[in-house]
Amino acid sequence: MTDALENLRQHLSDELGATLRTAHLDRGELTVELSREGFPAACLLLRDDVACAFDLLVDVCGVDYSAYGEGLWEGPRFAVVYHLLSLKHRQRLRVRIFADDDLPIVPSVVEVWAAANWFEREAFDLYGILFDGHPDLRRILTDYGFVGHPFRKDFPLVGTVEMRYDADQGRVVYEPTRTEERVVVPRIIREAGEGRYNARNQ
């Protein structure tokens, strides 16, 4: 399998040229990073080229890399990751494309893989990543009046409003939260020399 993925990596390097930024093979998985400029054409090649034949889009997800690696990440904040499957060659491929930090926009792949429709809407809803050319880019999981994108790492942990169904009005209403603002994070404080990982206890 590794030989086949190595051949695929070389083929993609030959065919995609400058569009292919990196191709990393690790633990039997090939991950490629593509540039935004050549991304739509690269997706068509991944689907239609007989040596690739990635006809099945398994998943699309957004990623927020802020504070990644305990704050050591210096690359772009947002990325979109596509997981592809070639039924013909029985191979998987992970494709990553980065977006701008201030206004994250990447090209939509709905025209290439129709299954991307709801996945891209989910990434928009949860991360605020825009997909240029998407036929119906609107929220899919949160309420239409929801403010913000809850999977962003800077999204507040404590809300200021709560919603409930009001039977008299026959709709969901928003009200200021009545709970005390606090963040409950489990903390374990041990005395020196206490705990199962102490040298005395081994």
Swiss-Prot record:
One of its GO terms (molecular function) is NADH:ubiquinone reductase (non-electrogenic) activity. The keyword NAD applies. Its EC number is 7.1.1.-. It catalyses: a quinone + NADH + 5 H(+)(in) = a quinol + NAD(+) + 4 H(+)(out). It holds the Pfam family Complex1_30kDa. It is a peripheral membrane protein. Disulfide bonds: none annotated. Belongs to the complex I 30 kDa subunit family. NDH-1 is composed of 14 different subunits. Subunits NuoB, C, D, E, F, and G constitute the peripheral sector of the complex. This is NADH-quinone oxidoreductase subunit C.
